[in-house]
Amino acid sequence: MKIVVIGSGLAGLTAALTLARRKQDVLLLEQNEFLGGVTSGFEKDGFRWDYGQLNLEAAGEDEPVGQVLELLGLRKLLQIVPEQRDYIFPDFEIRTPAEYGGVKWRIEYLKQLFPAEAEGLERYWADYVRFTRLMTLARRMEKGGLGAKAAFYTSLLPLISKKDWTAEQLLAHYFTDEKLKAVFVSILADFFTPPSQFQGLGVFAINAERAYERRMPAQLARNAEMLGLYAVAGGMKELIRIYEVAIKAAGVSTRYNTTVTRIVVEHNQVSGVVDQDGKLYPCDCVVASGGAKETFFNLLDPAVLPEDFSARVKDIPLMDSVFMLHLGVDEAYPEVLRSTSTYFYGSYDIEGQVKQAQEGIYHEGKAGFVVHLPSLRSPAMAPKGKYAMTIYTICPEKLKSSNWEKDKEKYAAKLLDYAEKYLPGLRKHILTQVIVTPLDLRRITHLQHHAFGGIAPLLNSWRVPHQTPVQGLWFIGAQSESGGGMNAVIPASFKVAQKIADSQRR
C-alpha cells in the first residue's frame, strides 16, 4: 500500500518508521529542510537548545514509550537517563533531598509545611496508590487476559465515585489550604487548563512521584508501578537523528521543503496529496499530523466531511503558546538549578493565571517561569565550561493589546528581571541569546495557532479521532485523540500505524 505521511514530528516519524517496518511503501513529506519540527531544536555559537523542557515520560525499559522505542530498535541507540523537576513557590521550595527519602518523601515534607493538612495528605496518598495500581492494570489489560480485566475493574471501584470530579473538586476533598492545592495543580498552567475544567483523577497522573525524585524505584506497591521522567543525552535532536537514520534504513522516501496544500479525495476515499508546486503524489492512505483545523479545513474540500464532524473540529480547545529565551551562559548556578528543569512560581492562583492568559494578557514572568538547563545532563550541548539554558513562560498565542514581534525585546528584558531575582547577575554571564516568540513557533510548525502541547485536556472535551470519516485518512499527533506530550503521541502513532498495516491482511 502506498502511504503518505504528512509531517515529521515524533508522531509522523513514529508512524512512518512503523509502517515501513511493516513493508508498506511510505513517503514522508516535511515542510521544513529538517526533520523533527520543534522537537529538533536548534544551534547557535556552539550552543544547542531544545524548544523548552522536552523530557520523555514513560521512556523506561518496561514503560509505554520505552517499549515502542525498543520495538523500533531505537532505545538501545539512545542514552536515556532518569530526570526530575524542582519547584520553587513564593513561600517554600520542593526540592529533591540530598539523601534519598523513600517513595513518600514529598508527602512527608508537605506534612511539615502544612501540619494541619496531614490527614488529608494521607487520604490523598492512599488514592494515589490506588490510581497508580489502576493505571498499571490498564496497561496490562491492553495485552489481554480476563484476569487483567477483572483486576482492573476491582481496582476502579474505590475511585469510581470521583470519576466525574474536576481537579478543583478533588483537591477540595483532601485539602483546605489554597497554597497546598496549588502544589498539586501548578503544572496545569503549562496545559492552559484551569483546575475547574481538568479531570479530577488526572491530578494523580500529573503528580507522578518519580518526577520529583529520579532515584525512586518504579514499584510503589503490589501491582502499582510508577512511570518515570527521563532526559535524552544530547537533547531531543539526538532522538530525531536516530529516527532519521532508522527511517532511511527502513526505506522511507523523504521529501523536504514540501508543503501539502491539498488532500485529494474521490468518492470518500483518499487518492493522493498535492504540494505547493501543484505536484500530485498518488496514494492509498494519508497519515496527517499537525494542526487539526489546518488539516481538515485547509487541505480538504469541506464537502467531504460530515457537518457535525467539522463543527466539532472547529471547537476543539487548544493550548496557547510559550515565550522562550535561549541563552548561552558561563555560569550554571548550581546552588539554585539542581535539576535540568526548575519551576519558579510567583502566584498560587493557577486558575486565575490560566484564565488571564486565555484572555490575551501576558504576565511577563511575574506569575512564574521555567529554567531548563540541559547541559546538566548533556554537557555536549554547549562549549566546554559553558551551559545551554532556556527560560520560558506560558503566554497568550496572540496578545490582547501588544505585538510579539514589536515587543519581544521588551518582554525578554522583563523576563530576565524576574529570573535575576533567583539567578543574581545572570545578564553578566550571557554569551549569546535567542528570543523565540509564538510567531516563530507558528512558522516552524506551519500552524495558524501555535499550541504548545496541542489540545488542552479539558474535562469531557471531544477529541479528533485517529480514524477520520474519510476512508484512508488518519490523523495523529498532539491535536488528535491521543492528546499532547511525547508520552502520548509516540505510543498512539505506533498503534495507529500497526492498525493500518494490519488492515492489509484482511
Predicted regions and their residues:
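Mid-domain catalytic core of redox enzymes
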Residues: 231-232, 259-382
